[in-house]
UniProtKB/Swiss-Prot annotation:
Sample GO molecular function, one term: cutinase activity
Keyword Nucleus in record: no
CC terms in the record's Gene Ontology section: extracellular region; periplasmic space
Gene name tied to this protein: cut1
Organism: Thermobifida cellulosilytica
Disulfide cross-links: C242-C260
Reaction catalysed by this enzyme: (ethylene terephthalate)(n) + H2O = (ethylene terephthalate)(n-1) + 4-[(2-hydroxyethoxy)carbonyl]benzoate + H(+); a butanoate ester + H2O = an aliphatic alcohol + butanoate + H(+); an acetyl ester + H2O = an aliphatic alcohol + acetate + H(+); cutin + H2O = cutin monomers
Protein name per its UniProtKB record: Cutinase 1
Function: Catalyzes the hydrolysis of cutin, a polyester that forms the structure of plant cuticle. Shows esterase activity towards p-nitrophenol-linked aliphatic esters (pNP-aliphatic esters). Capable of degrading the plastic poly(ethylene terephthalate) (PET), the most abundant polyester plastic in the world. Capable of degrading the bioplastic poly(lactic acid) (PLLA).
SUPFAM superfamilies: alpha/beta-Hydrolases
Main location: secreted
Amino acid sequence: MANPYERGPNPTDALLEASSGPFSVSEENVSRLSASGFGGGTIYYPRENNTYGAVAISPGYTGTEASIAWLGERIASHGFVVITIDTITTLDQPDSRAEQLNAALNHMINRASSTVRSRIDSSRLAVMGHSMGGGGTLRLASQRPDLKAAIPLTPWHLNKNWSSVTVPTLIIGADLDTIAPVATHAKPFYNSLPSSISKAYLELDGATHFAPNIPNKIIGKYSVAWLKRFVDNDTRYTQFLCPGPRDGLFGEVEEYRSTCPF
């Protein structure tokens, strides 16, 4: 039986590594004044009239929405409704960012324009975040098992135990990260996630804590593949995640591990 959530053409490496996907995208501004529980942002949505999964993305400590805007447009162009947010203050801690990601999802579902609301399948939601926003992503995933996917990007959190998370989680770390070193953040986070869930750890080679702030084909490719696989239940994308990217010498990926098959 055909998957009712399948959107877009059969995927290829070239399609996933390109700067934009197959869907034309429009934007809707969310002013700080109209936002409840977060600092405003931008909603990116496919122009094609259909229903899509929805994703909220948080910046990191001291970061603004501009630092993650590329991800909003990139992911929406593959068939998702995406909100990239400003936090209430740039110094908000990870657990506050979790609350704000949740508020942003609620805004898209309940308070956005009818054009946006009509495109959202509210049963298929996901969250992403950079740095402390990645920590917030983990926190919200631990609080909302109904989420379909979580993607922390070079995440930072003081809590190292995420054994209560059941949401399919892709953690992306960076080998040269000195702000949230993978040895004390991304790797322990990944290891603490239950081995029974769908999870993956991808470590970028030659990359710093701020790799997610500029367009990055590896982050784009594997984030889209993860969202497609778990938000859309689209098994056409499993081929990119299992066995996943080759790691090691001269690659863009330092390390990849997962609980494949999924």
